[in-house]
UniProtKB/Swiss-Prot annotation:
This is Glycogen debranching enzyme. Belongs to the glycosyl hydrolase 13 family. It is an enzyme of class 3 (hydrolase). It comes from the Bacteria. It holds the Pfam family CBM_48. Its EC number is 3.2.1.196. Gene3D superfamilies: Glycosidases, Golgi alpha-mannosidase II, Immunoglobulins. The keyword Cytoplasm does not apply. HAMAP family: GlgX. Removes maltotriose and maltotetraose chains that are attached by 1,6-alpha-linkage to the limit dextrin main chain, generating a debranched limit dextrin.
Length: 657
């Protein structure tokens, strides 16, 4: 039987050098680590890792080749009160595995035990890691390096974006390949998108609870192997990595960046009753935040929380991020529940992972976007992330909806959000682009549902409509649900136009949810995380071409306005912005706080956004000069307006002088 050589303690994971494979695994509390390899017949062969450098266990298997399936058995104490849950009867996934063979099914054998260990062996059904070799021809690929001030983000799901697209070949719909198909790329270019932000593509598992209900995790925020691509989005699991890189290369050639939504806050092992896949059995005490009683701190709402202040876990997370940049050429990350990244356990801007990213010559050069909260006390950290990060701006989302759909936001508050929320983000040398403005996202109502539903309708999720937020700031315009009279449809359309205009012509970095430009509806489901079906897949055959054209025209208009593209804070008198009332005069203090919802925003002294958010037709006196409405607010025959715009109720228009 082949013997393992000691090998090297770096890099993490399994790496083929042409002669064999080097294996490394971190565990500070293990007493012994077995490498388990499986031949073509499924026969298991076990080897003790002979090397032990600090907390890294390692060994080298001569003559091993790519395609080898493997896992680990980790020996150590079973002491739940101290946070130790070692169980060598369970085969474990390498946290740095780059490919997984097998499915993460709901099976009692994939549990370690709660108070007492479950010593039933699970190697026959446990997923296995696969050794991969990294040879890929990137040709002349180069990152687009789109300046932040010019960035337009499009948030999309790999499958949902293309699964029903009639012009994409059936055999690749819903896959990585479809992202790089010319039809998809041409669409994104025509729309004006500069960055495609993908919901999680790292391998994830469906929670046992969902599997028992016949559902699955659709969004992907339940990670199990952070270095491995989710195989369900590939035409073939064996070629997933190349399919993904082909798509990125094609998008880059079109000048479109790729941003990955990544989940560095919890794992699919969930709470103590959850499955055992990897980290819990490798070194539970190090990988997770553990309470004094040995249970998990659940600061994520998912049962566990990664301890990203532990040096080894910081190294793991940093290596993961570098892998996606260096191996797949991704251009940035959106971090789910990113406040966890800064916990020590208190949130700190100089937390170890933040410091590691800032000091890394690779990671410090890509786009970094935080979802700036978690669910723990002190978890709401909007505006408090380090300068390298942009942040989701929920202030903007709520303000835009309240102003246009609830009519209860003063002009001053609306203007503050329109101006990149400088009260929140203008600190530590940050620029307006640090504010990622959004009206909708994957989590919550779609834009169409914002104007069609007053209440969530999440019954299909199997939780009796308890899940999902109740704070939607939506307005059904008088009738719950889709459809209605022509007048109702037109009023809803006007609200959609107003919200899109606010999003795409405001200062900051706009993020558009895929499908909003089509009029996509999830029929009132504002938490469709487990709906892998036509509720979430974009139906291109039903897309509103008029709304798509309206959205594209807004994006292209944005790119013509210097005040929005220069990424500089607006200052009084700098010519970037003037705020005027309905009479084209500067607003008084009282008008800012108590005035009617009528406002004129003059950008770069040439572009005028006239707003009448009241319920009555109102005359808006335009500033001096000859003005004409511009697309998407007027057709080819634009009359010159020299004095007054008859502002329709709940309407707005953009003019150019």
């Amino acid at each position: 039987m082949t013997q393992l050589a000691i090998g090297k303690p770096t890099p993490l994971g399994a790496h083929y050098d042409g002669q064999g494979v080097n294996f490394t695994l971190f565990s500070a509390h293990a007493e012994r680590v077995e490498l388990c390899v499986f031949d073509a017949n499924g026969q298991e062969h076990r080897y003790d890792l002979p090397g032990h450098s600090g907390d890294i266990w390692h060994g080298y298997l001569p003559d091993a080749r790519p395609g080898l399936r493997y896992g680990y058995r980790v020996h150590g104490p079973w002491q739940p009160a101290e946070g130790h849950r070692f169980n060598p009867a369970k085969l474990l996934i390498d946290p740095c595995a780059r490919q997984i063979d097998g499915e993460f099914k709901d099976n009692p054998l994939l549990h370690a035990g709660h108070n007492e260990p479950d010593y039933r062996d699970n190697a026959s059904i446990a997923p296995k890691c696969v050794v991969v070799v990294d040879h890929y021809d990137w040709e002349d690929d180069a990152p687009p390096r789109m300046p932040w001030g010019c960035t337009i983000i499009y948030e999309a799901h790999v499958k949902g974006l293309t699964y029903l697209h009639p012009e994409i070949p059936v055999e690749i719909r819903g896959t990585y390949k479809a992202l790089g198909h010319p039809v998809m790329i041409n669409y994104l270019k025509q729309l004006g998108i500069t960055a495609l932000e993908l919901l999680p593509v790292a391998q994830f598992a469906s929670e046992p609870r969902l599997q028992r209900m016949g559902l699955s995790n659709y969004w992907g925020y339940n990670p199990v192997a952070m270095f491995a691509l989710h195989p369900a989005y590939a035409c073939s699991p064996e070629t997933a990595l190349d399919e993904f890189r082909d798509a990125i290369k094609a998008l880059h050639k079109a000048g479109i960046e790729v941003i990955l939504d990544i989940v560095l806050n919890h794992s699919a092992e969930l709470d103590l009753d959850g499955p055992l896949f990897s980290l819990r059995g490798i070194d539970n005490r190090s990988y997770y935040w553990i309470r004094e009683d040995g249970d998990y701190h659940n600061w994520t709402g998912c049962g566990n929380t990664l301890n990203l202040s532990h040096p080894a876990v910081v190294d793991y997370a940093s290596a993961c991020l570098r892998y996606w940049v260096e191996t797949c050429h991704v251009d940035g990350f959106r971090f789910d529940l990113a406040a966890v990244m800064g916990r020590t356990p208190e949130f700190r801007q100089d937390a170890p992972l933040f410091t590691a990213i800032q000091n890394c010559p690779v990671l410090s050069q890509v786009k970094l976007i935080a979802e700036p909260w978690d669910i723990a006390p002190g978890g709401y950290q909007v505006g408090n992330f380090p300068p390298l990060f942009a942040e989701w701006n929920d202030h903007f989302r709520d303000a835009a909806r309240r102003f246009w759909l609830h009519y209860d936001l003063p002009l001053g508050a609306f203007a503050g959000r329109f101006a990149a929320s400088s009260d929140v983000f203008k600190r530590n040398g940050r620029l307006p682009s640090a504010a990622i403005n959004l009206v909708t996202a994957h989590d919550g109502f779609t834009l169409r549902d914002c104007v069609c539903f007053n209440h969530k309708h999440n019954e299909a999720n199997g939780e009796e409509n308890r899940d999902g937020t109740n704070n939607n700031y939506s307005n059904n315009h008088g009738k719950e649900g889709l459809g209605g009279t022509l007048d109702l449809v037109e009023r809803r359309r006007d609200s959609i136009h107003a919200l899109l205009t606010t999003l795409l012509l405001s200062q900051g970095t706009p993020m558009l949810l895929a499908g909003d430009e089509h009029g996509h509806s999830q029929r009132g489901n504002n938490n469709a995380y487990c709906q892998d079906n036509q509720l979430t897949w974009l139906d291109w055959s039903q897309a509103s071409s008029g709304l798509t054209a309206f959205t594209a025209a807004l994006i292209h208009l944005r790119k013509r306005i210097p005040a929005l593209m220069e990424n500089r804070w607006w200052e009084e008198g700098d010519g970037n912005v003037r705020w005027l009332n309905r009479y084209a005069q500067p607003l008084s203090t009282d008008e800012w706080q108590n005035g009617p919802k009528q406002l004129q925003i003059l950008l770069s002294d040439r572009f005028l956004i006239a707003i009448n958010a009241t319920l009555e037709v109102t005359e808006i006196v335009l500033p001096a000069g000859e003005w004409h409405a511009i697309p998407p607010f007027a057709g080819e025959d634009n009359p010159v307006i020299t004095a007054v715009w008859q502002g329709p109720a709940h309407g707005l228009c953009v003019f150019q002088r």
